[in-house]
Each structure stands twice: as C-alpha cells, then as structure tokens.
C-alpha cells in the first residue's frame, strides 16, 4: 500500500537529528445554537478527540502540522438534521487527513501540502456513496443527493475553499497561532479576516486585542477580545444573504449585523502548545437572528 505524505514524514523524522517531532491529544466540546426571532431553531452539540502533530526543521525555518480527527459524536435538535450530519462527519474524517504547511512568521496555516491525497480519498468516498444510493427511484431524492455531493466536492477539490473552511473551525483558530513558531502576541492588536459562521463564504475585517491575565516562567493565560467596524455591520452582501435565506421565515427586515469573538487560552509557552482554551462566538442580525458558538478544548493523555 502506498504510504501517505505524513507517514513518509514520520519515517524521515526517525532518520534525521535536525527535525523535531511533537504531538498532543485534545478533547473539543462545542455547542452551536441558532435562534430565529429569539426562539431556538437548531442546536448542535459536538464532542471530538483530535491528535495534533507537528514537525519542525531545526536548521531552517520550516514546519508541517497534522490534526487527525480520532472520534466524534454529534447530537442535533431537531432530529431531522441528524442523518445529513452523519454524512458530514464521514467527510470531516477525510478532510482532517490534511497536512498543513505553517507560516513561520505567524503560526497560521499557509497551505495543504497533501491536497492531492485528500482529493483522492474524496473521489473514493464519492464513488462508494453513489453506489450505496444507486437504488434511489425518486427524482427529488436523487437531486438532493447529487446537490449534497456537488456542494462537498466544490470545497474539497479547491484548496483555497478547503483552507477557508478549516479557518472557520474553532479548534484551528485556537491551535494555529504565533506561539506555535515561538512568536506569541500578547500586546499588539491584530486584524484578521473573520470567516462568518452564519453566512457561508462571507468574510469581514475584525480586530483582536490581547490581554495577559496571569503569567509564570513557563505558562501564560491570556484573552482575546474582538471589535468590528460599523462598515462591516451594514455590508450589502450580508443583507442580501439575510433577505434570501432568513427573511422569508422571519419576515422582519434586515436591521444591522454584529459579531463578537472572545477567547481565554492557557498556553505552555516553553513547550509551545495550548493546554486548554475556551472561546465564544456570537453573530447576529440584531433582534432577528443569532448564532452562538461555545467551544472548549483541553489537552488529554
């Protein structure tokens, strides 16, 4: 059987003394609540275990990282959403075979070095899925299955779209940062392109301000708080998305958009890894629609 890119990296690590290999396991528990006109419409609770591995070349600045999804459990209300989520979990395991090139200036993901492997795994999964649903007779059901496959394929085969999806996942926002390359930021504000969780494909400028809460020789506890410009709150693209997707059921017209991101991180600065973290994201069309995400991660053995 052909070895994967990451298996080959493992073998090279064993043969070279200028390469540093590290790994941690994390447990991530996340709750997403969507409310329409103040009434809960959908709640998704996800429990996941991940293996986070990274390799650094000690002679020249270069790093690869790999975050494998070990197991995942999802509960959803209303239950009618459960079946589509089960297929999405299968696809998550494929996506999480990605190996990332790390930007040595920021600690952020710069690209997927084994993207071709992910596409190959997707093609195999798609073939099996089409075989499993070949019995379908209903034209509407067939159309829904094909639409689902097309929407997934659009993301997986496009490295930039897949990267954007990873940046929308809380665990990636928390694990991939300056500390990973020995350049943590506890003072200066940073500007990011925040990926909306409420409106797919929408990004807008967000300013993050750090503040140290507690520190020792080896560890730091710090928080990040966000601010969004008034321009982003009234963006035409968000208004258009709201009018098309939500206004028909909510009826109330678009008011204004707001988003908040807050996180608390316990960082082992000496060994350069997150020990535990908690973050909140809230997005809303004021008075009409809201999405709240609460995510906690912690290192496990």
Language model features by range: what are they?
Residues 2-301:
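Signature of exported/secreted
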């Amino acid at each position: 059987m052909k070895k994967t890119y990451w298996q080959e990296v493992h073998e090279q690590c064993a043969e070279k003394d200028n390469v540093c290999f590290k790994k941690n396991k994390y447990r991530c528990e996340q709750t997403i609540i969507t409310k329409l006109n103040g009434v809960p419409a959908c709640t998704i609770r996800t429990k996941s275990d991940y293996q986070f591995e990274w390799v650094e070349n000690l002679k020249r600045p270069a790093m690869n990282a790999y975050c494998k999804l070990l197991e995942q459990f999802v509960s959803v209300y209303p239950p009618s959403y459960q079946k589509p989520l089960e297929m999405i979990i299968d696809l998550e395991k494929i996506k999480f075979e990605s190996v990332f090139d790390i930007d040595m200036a920021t600690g952020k993901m710069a690209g997927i070095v084994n993207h071709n492997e992910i596409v190959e795994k997707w093609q195999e999964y798609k073939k099996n899925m089409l075989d499993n649903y070949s019995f379908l007779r209903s034209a509407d059901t067939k159309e829904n299955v094909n639409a689902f496959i097309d929407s997934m394929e659009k993301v997986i085969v496009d490295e930039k779209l897949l990267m954007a999806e990873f940046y929308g996942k809380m665990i990636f926002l928390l694990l991939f940062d300056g500390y990973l390359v020995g350049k943590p930021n506890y003072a200066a504000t940073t500007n990011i392109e925040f990926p909306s969780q409420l409106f797919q494909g929408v990004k807008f400028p967000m300013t993050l301000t750090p503040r140290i809460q507690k520190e020792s020789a080896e560890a730091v506890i710090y928080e990040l708080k966000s601010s969004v410009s008034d321009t982003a709150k009234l963006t035409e693209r968000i208004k258009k998305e709201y009018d098309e997707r939500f206004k028909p059921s909510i009826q109330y017209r678009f008011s204004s958009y707001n988003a908040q991101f807050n996180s608390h991180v316990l960082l082992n600065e000496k060994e350069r890894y997150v020990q535990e973290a908690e973050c909140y994201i809230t997005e809303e069309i004021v008075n009409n629609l809201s999405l709240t995400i609460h995510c906690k991660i912690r290192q496990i053995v």
